[in-house]
Amino acid sequence: MDPRSEVLLRQAELFGGRVLLAGLPADDLLGQLAGATAWSWHAGEQQQLDKRFGGRCSFGVAPPQGVFDTAVLFLPKSRELTDYLLQTLAARLPGRPLYLVGEKRGGIERAAKQLGSFGRARKLDSARHCQLWQVEVEQAPAAPNLDALARHFTLQLADGPLEVVSLPGVFSHGRLDLGSALLLEHLDNLPGGRLLDFGCGAGILGATLKRRYPQSELVLLDVDAFAVESSRRTLAANGLEAEVIAGDGIDAAPRQLAAIISNPPFHQGVHTSYHASETLIERAAEHLQASGEMRIVANAFLRYPPLIERHLGTCQTLAERDGFRIYRAVRG
């Protein structure tokens, strides 16, 4: 059981009614709270919850419809996403309690201050390096408009200006990160066919690929619902069309790909995790056609070349800058 869930269950009498659990971990909490409904924006956690508690978990950038007696937000990493989620939940709970739970090292005490705009916040419990906060929603806000929270910016790229739409919680929100900037300079001479942007974020790499290779079929994949929505908006802003899907890791990707392009993710919530990128390398060959190519950017200190050569083929370093390297390998 996740320690945040354990803290909630210490106060289980507060959550006996119709409770919405937002951003909950994929543990047994839903099984302990019979009246609870889950809202997740992480495709992997949603899939696990749906297998165990079918019909009780909603996925997306907006909460499920219905009336709730209370809601609990499991603190996400992004402060801007936290603000959007708290406002979204508080708008549905006038005169009712809203709870916030999170790890101390994840910034729960700072985030709890955001509850003050809805009423008087108080700390209910502290255990397992986590805290549980409550606020009675006396000043319910209007439901926030996700469009108004999006950041729009233009990148001047070799193929021309690219309009980017970035939503709260998406990696490198509102800016181009150094790794992707380097990879954008090394997208030439990709094989024709079906291309995958793995861990698509705001869709910058995917949109660039579609402009450069308009005859290729493009798939963008991310585990996060806000990233999926951002990519769709970025494509639309540039008059481009592609398939954008939510899925947990490379196993959710189609087969017979001509190329996989990625600035692979390295966070799971507030924690650093290289599981998704390592699994991508280990299983890329299963998703590539013969002579298909993988091209990724990664921190230079990560020992990916031996892993790439073990599972895919000869690893070439195409470029190095700002602490990042571009690796290329072709399936034999």
From Swiss-Prot:
The cross-references to CDD domains, in alphabetical order and at most eight, read:
AdoMet_MTases
Record keywords: Cytoplasm, Methyltransferase, rRNA processing, S-adenosyl-L-methionine, Transferase
Keyword field contains Transferase? yes
The principal location of this protein is cytoplasm
- What Enzyme Commission number(s) apply to this enzyme? 2.1.1.172
Which subcellular locations apply to this protein?
Answer: Cytoplasm
The reaction(s) this protein catalyses: guanosine(1207) in 16S rRNA + S-adenosyl-L-methionine = N(2)-methylguanosine(1207) in 16S rRNA + S-adenosyl-L-homocysteine + H(+)
A Pfam family that this protein carries is: MTS
Described function: Specifically methylates the guanine in position 1207 of 16S rRNA in the 30S particle.
Q: Which HAMAP family match?
A: 16SrRNA_methyltr_C
The protein's name is Ribosomal RNA small subunit methyltransferase C
Instruction: Give the source species.
Output: Stutzerimonas stutzeri (strain A1501) (Pseudomonas stutzeri)
